[in-house]
Structures are given as C-alpha cells and as structure tokens.
C-alpha cells in the first residue's frame, strides 16, 4: 500500500499509463489508487490520474483519519484490506472498503474515488482553464 501522497499519486499514474497501453485511440485512461498519508494526520486518501496519451489530469478525493489501531497495523506492514476485514469480522475490502467501515457506510469505497476522478478529468472537460 502506498504510504504517502506522492506514492499514491504515482500508483494512480501507473495504473492510468497501463490502461492507456491497452486502449486504441481515441481514449481516456483513468487510474485510481488509495493510500495512506501521515501529514499532518494519519489518513486514508484516494488519488486519480487521467490521460489521453498527451495530457494528464490529477485529482484527490476526501480523506479520513484512520483509528490509531488500524494505522499502527498498516504502518507495521499489514495490508489495509486484511486489517479492515478483521475489524469488520468478514471480507469487506472489495465492497464497503475502509471508507464504508469507518463511516458506517455513509461513504463507501466507490464514493471515495468519485471526487478524485471528477477532479482528474477537469483538464479534459474544462480545457480552456487548463491550457
């Protein structure tokens, strides 16, 4: 799991680049990545990267502070998915995700990436301002 904003953004960029390599033009490839950031607080964050092969757009979603016990486990080397599955008592990593667990499903895993994706696409749907 990425352990900083820079690592999380790089993961999103790598996923978008990989998607772009499999697409036929014209395309718009998007990569999503979740990770941890410890500045100024230990938070779960989401980044999105988008490319059309020439231009790039980036966006970050909301953040949520991780409970100390979960943050400690992840910083100690455990996968966040394993930790949240254990905390929930069953597998939720691919459905509710950490966001769903932490917010009692007010915000879900999918929701966490919506703002990031919309922000990453801004240079494509609003090109006049992003010249």
Report the location of each language-model feature.
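Anionic-ligand binding patches
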Residues: 2-131
